[in-house]
Amino acid sequence: MIDALEFAKGLNPQPVVIAHHPSRSAKEESVFGLTTPAELRRWNDAAPNIAVGMEGAPGHQAAELRKADDRGSYPAWVYARGAYGRGFPTMGGFDQMTAIVGGFWDAMLGEGRRWWITANSDSHIHYTEGGIDFWPGEYSKTFVHAEKTHDGILESMRAGRMFVVTGDLITALDVTLSDGVTSVGWGETLKTKLGSKLTLEIAVTDPEETNAAGRNPLLNRIDLIMGAVTGPQENVDLAQNPTTGVVERVSREAFEGVDGQYLIRSELTADVNGYMRLRGTNTDSLEPEKDPLGEDPWSDLWFYSNPVFIELID
């Protein structure tokens, strides 16, 4: 893979490489299989402008929707969400590397790496045609804030200007972090002084329309997750960032707005080099739970934003 990344660095335009279903072969929490933290760090070290992230929500999540009399063509483990049935399951439809607060994703962000998440259908064969997949965009979506050009989309993916969502829980998300002088959004870095008062503004759309399942899920809560950036770590297998946690939970009752258009504000203080990211769900679960076999994917929906960084300056 490193040879391939070195070759790709010479291409014009350069591609974007995303690690797919990174924990499908993991046997336990933080006991990884074919894809390890060390391997993903090597990719990012070799080509930080190409190997920029991983699949947060894997595809293959429609197996449970197949007709009961049409299940003999696949082994039982395939019917877990994401086909994660041979080891550690998905959590709210997301890979453990993304879903666990203070886990691998936060370890990468805590090193200051610009390491982003995406979601896709991995659509081989639709579940109505004998497969276990949704059509592209039917269930999982990656929203990219970009000019509608090939170059613009690749540039924004490299820069982390993306959020991911399942089941059309939300259809728009804007994040602005400001110290009163400078404002930044996803993937960007706010350079500010120690002790600066910061304002985080979240604009979100919870659509008043049905998704592909004919349902209209309600966004129940948004979580603000923050962690410290402490720099590169010697342990290349590190998959934890103990500084990361949920610092605020905003319930639907506290949303300001009408007709599904909501604005949420939070006041913060710049006290450490760090980052913040958002997560939301239609469930009452404080954290995404391990997905059991037989779960209806449309009932357990989440969104995740990519992070905004804070860098303290003199």
Regions found by a protein language model. Give the residues of each.
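A solvent-exposed, charged loop/short amphipathic helix patch at secondary-structure junctions
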Residues: 68-91
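The substrate-binding groove and active-site-proximal loops of carbohydrate-active enzymes
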Residues: 28-33, 84-98
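Catalytic pocket-lining loop regions of alpha/beta-barrel enzymes
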Residues: 41, 52-54, 81-82, 86-88, ...
